[in-house]
C-alpha cells in the first residue's frame, strides 16, 4: 500500500467533496494519519470531543472512502495524542509521574491536565484570585496559607486549584501534591474508621506538601469529619505545608461549620471569583474554540457571550452545542443558527428586560394614543388615564427611580408618578375591566 500520509491526504480530498464545508472544517480538517497495522487504520483526532464525534458520525464514510481509493476493507480507529504510546504523540511529560515512586498508599494528585495557568482566562471577576493562586504556586506556604477561594459554580475555582498543583509539580517534581473534594475526604475518613485504618488515613493526608481541597462547604454538619480535618489542617500548617481551599461561599456563611475551623480558614487570604464580564466571556469562547480546533465567526461568539452570562461551564457548553447543531443540519455557523441551537436554554437563563419606552409603546397601542402624548402636557382623560397606567407599570415592572420615570413622561415631578401609582393601585382592587386591561398589557410586555 502507498504511503499512509499520502493515502490519508487523498481520502480527505474525497471526503471534503462529500461533506458540507462547516462539517469538513470542524471535524475532518484537523485529523492526521497515525498508523496502519494489519487491517486497522488509526487516525489522530485533536481532542476527545472530536474523537467521539468522528466515531459516532463518520466511521462508515471514512471506511468507504478508503475502500474506493485502495480496494481494501480497513477498519478505522480514532485516537487522541494522550492515548497513544509513541513518544512523539504524547503530550509534554507530566513531572507529577514522580509520585509513582512514593509508597502505594500515597494518594494520587488527581490533577486535570487541561487546568493550568496557561489555559486560564483572566478577567475583572477573577484577576485577584488568579494573582493570589499564582503567588501561592510560586512560594507554597510562604505567600498565603491557607488560600481560600470562593464563588459560584463553574467560575474557575477548581481550575485555579489544579493550576496551582501543576505549577508546584512542574517546578518541584518531588513535591507531594494532592487534590480532592471534601466529599472524597469524608468518604475515605468514614471507610478508614470502618476498616480500622484511621492511622493510615491520617498519614496519607498529613504528609503532603500541598493539599488542595475542593467544595469545603460540604463538611458542614459533619462533626467527626470536621474534627479530623481540623487536626489535618493544624498538622500541615504547623509544618509549613500549603493548604488551598475552595467553597461556594465565604467561611462566615458556611452553616454549622465549627468556629475553630472557620477562624483557621480566615488565617490566610480569602478571595472570591465573580461571573465573567462580556469581554472575558468572549475571550473564554475564543480560547475554547482554539483549543478544540474550531473555526467560529466573531458574531457567533458575541451572540453566545451576550446570552450566557451565568458561568464558564454553561458558556463553553453552549459553544459545543452550536458546533454540534451546525454539523447535524449541515449548515454554516452564524448568529441565526446559534440562536436556533440555543433556543431551548436561553429563555430560562435570560429574562427579557422591560423598559419604560416599551411600556409606553404597548400602552399606546392598547389605548390608541401616540408615544409623544405620554410626554405632552395634555390632561384630557383619553390621554391622562393611559399615561397613569404607563407610570404605574413603569414603577411595577422596571427598576427605574421615581425621578427617572417622571423624566421619561415629559419631565414630570416624582410626586406625579407616586399619585399615578396610588390611583391605579386603588382602582385595580375593584375595577375588573381595568384588571383585565393591565393583565393583557403585562402579557404583551413579557
Curated annotation (Swiss-Prot):
SMART domains: AAA, Bac_DnaA_C. ATP binds at residues 154, 156-158. Residues 327-446 are annotated as: Domain IV, binds dsDNA. InterPro entries: AAA+_ATPase, Chromosome_initiator_DnaA, Chromosome_initiator_DnaA-like, Chromosome_initiator_DnaA_CS, DnaA_C, DnaA_dom, DnaA_N_dom, DnaA_N_sf. Gene3D superfamilies: 1.10.1750.10, 1.10.8.60, 3.30.300.180, P-loop containing nucleotide triphosphate hydrolases. Coiled coil: none annotated. Residues 1-72 are annotated as: Domain I, interacts with DnaA modulators. Disulfide bonds: none annotated. Domain I is involved in oligomerization and binding regulators, domain II is flexibile and of varying length in different bacteria, domain III forms the AAA+ region, while domain IV binds dsDNA. This is Chromosomal replication initiator protein DnaA.
Amino acid at each position: 500500500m502507498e504511503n499512509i500520509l499520502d493515502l490519508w491526504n487523498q481520502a480527505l480530498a474525497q471526503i471534503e467533496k462529500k461533506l458540507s464545508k462547516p462539517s469538513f472544517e470542524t471535524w475532518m480538517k484537523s485529523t492526521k494519519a497515525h498508523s496502519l497495522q494489519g487491517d486497522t487504520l488509526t487516525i489522530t483526532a485533536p481532542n476527545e470531543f472530536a474523537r467521539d464525534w468522528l466515531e459516532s458520525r463518520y466511521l462508515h464514510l471514512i471506511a468507504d472512502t478508503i475502500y474506493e481509493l485502495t480496494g481494501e476493507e480497513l477498519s478505522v480507529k480514532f485516537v487522541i495524542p494522550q492515548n497513544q504510546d509513541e513518544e512523539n504523540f504524547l503530550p509534554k511529560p507530566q513531572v507529577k509521574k514522580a509520585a509513582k515512586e512514593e509508597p502505594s498508599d500515597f494518594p494520587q494528585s488527581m490533577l486535570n491536565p487541561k487546568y493550568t495557568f496557561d489555559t486560564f482566562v483572566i478577567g475583572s471577576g477573577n484577576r485577584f484570585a488568579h494573582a493570589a493562586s499564582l503567588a501561592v504556586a510560586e512560594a507554597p506556604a510562604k505567600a498565603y496559607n491557607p488560600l481560600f477561594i470562593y464563588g459560584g459554580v463553574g467560575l474557575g475555582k477548581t481550575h485555579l486549584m489544579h493550576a496551582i498543583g501543576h505549577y508546584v509539580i512542574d517546578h518541584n517534581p518531588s513535591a507531594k501534591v494532592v487534590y480532592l473534594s471534601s466529599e472524597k475526604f469524608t468518604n475515605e475518613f468514614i471507610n478508614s474508621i470502618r476498616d480500622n485504618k484511621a492511622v493510615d488515613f491520617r498519614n496519607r493526608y498529613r504528609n503532603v506538601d500541598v493539599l488542595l481541597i475542593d467544595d469545603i462547604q460540604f463538611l458542614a454538619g459533619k462533626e467527626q469529619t470536621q474534627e479530623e480535618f481540623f487536626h489535618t489542617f493544624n498538622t500541615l500548617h504547623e509544618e509549613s505545608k500549603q493548604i488551598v481551599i475552595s467553597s461556594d461561599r465565604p467561611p462566615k456563611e458556611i452553616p454549622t461549620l465549627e468556629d475553630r475551623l472557620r477562624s483557621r480558614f480566615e488565617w490566610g487570604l480569602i478571595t472570591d471569583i465573580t461571573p465573567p464580564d462580556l469581554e472575558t466571556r468572549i475571550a473564554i469562547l475564543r480560547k475554547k474554540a482554539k483549543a478544540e480546533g474550531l473555526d467560529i465567526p466573531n458574531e457567533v461568539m458575541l451572540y453566545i457571550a451576550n446570552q450566557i452570562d451565568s458561568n464558564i461551564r454553561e458558556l463553553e457548553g453552549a459553544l459545543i452545542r452550536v458546533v454540534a447543531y451546525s454539523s447535524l443540519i449541515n449548515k454554516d455557523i452564524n448568529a441565526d443558527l446559534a440562536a436556533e441551537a440555543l433556543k431551548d436554554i436561553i429563555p430560562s437563563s435570560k429574562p427579557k428586560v422591560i423598559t419604560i419606552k416599551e411600556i409606553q409603546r404597548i400602552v399606546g397601542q392598547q389605548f390608541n394614543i401616540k408615544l409623544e402624548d405620554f410626554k405632552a402636557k395634555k390632561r384630557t382623560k383619553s390621554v391622562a388615564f393611559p399615561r397613569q397606567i404607563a407610570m404605574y407599570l413603569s414603577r411595577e415592572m422596571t427598576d427605574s427611580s421615581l425621578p427617572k420615570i417622571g423624566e421619561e413622561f415629559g419631565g414630570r415631578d416624582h410626586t406625579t408618578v407616586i399619585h399615578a401609582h396610588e390611583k391605579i393601585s386603588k382602582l385595580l382592587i375593584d375595577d375588573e375591566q381595568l384588571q383585565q386591561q393591565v393583565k393583557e398589557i403585562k402579557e404583551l410586555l413579557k
